[in-house]
């Protein structure tokens, strides 16, 4: 189950990062807020709680 949750979080984070490349999304949200706030807005999960066990979150 833990691996499934990790896979879902990783795939969702990749989708969020992919959305950041779209011009419409870039116009709606500043790029400075994209790295810190995108996951919090789309996943409703604080990025700080993911980082300790997800070294690839940056």
Swiss-Prot record:
Tissue expression pattern? Expressed by the venom duct.
4-hydroxyproline PTM sites in chain numbering: 52
Residues bearing Cysteine amide? 57
Q: What are the disulphide bonds in this sequence?
A: 51-57
Protein's cellular compartments? Secreted
Q: Name one GO cellular component term.
A: extracellular region
**Alphabetically ordered keywords of this record:** Amidation, D-amino acid, Disulfide bond, Hydroxylation, Neurotoxin, Secreted, Signal, Toxin
Provide the leader sequence positions.
1-18
Function recorded in the entry: Its target is unknown, but this toxin may modulate voltage-activated calcium channels (Cav) or calcium-dependent potassium channels (KCa).
> Into which family does the record put it?
Belongs to the O2 superfamily. Contryphan family.
Further remark = Exists in two forms, due to cis-trans isomerization at 51-Cys-hydroxyPro-52. The cis conformation is the major form.
Protein name (record): Contryphan-Lnv
